[in-house]
Amino acid sequence: MPTLTPGRVRHGVVFTLKHPEGSPEEADFLKANSELASIPGVEAFEIMREVSPKNPYRFSLVMEFVDRAAYDAYSAHPDHVSFVRDLVVPAVTDFLELDSEAL
């Protein structure tokens, strides 16, 4: 991702799933995450596998928004709310969310 310009927001989540590594359930969950990119306001989207042994997480998801208002609208969007409720809560064992604004 390019350098964040002032005012833009980068939303990141690192997480670990309940599903066994390499399982069909893991693959389905990761594929479903791409649906978040279609929610209005999402301007950049990446989902990645964590490679550092320095943290306990297995995956990361990063997206960018033009500003806080766009991020807030995304967070409250019904598709995001239902995604978290129906897919994230049952499947994720641990996570850390980082929401950052460029200086």
Model-derived features: positions:
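Short S/T/G/P-rich N-terminal loop/turn motif that feeds into the first structured element of a domain
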Residues: 1-59, 66-76, 99-103
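C-terminal structural segments of small proteins and small subunits
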Residues: 68-96
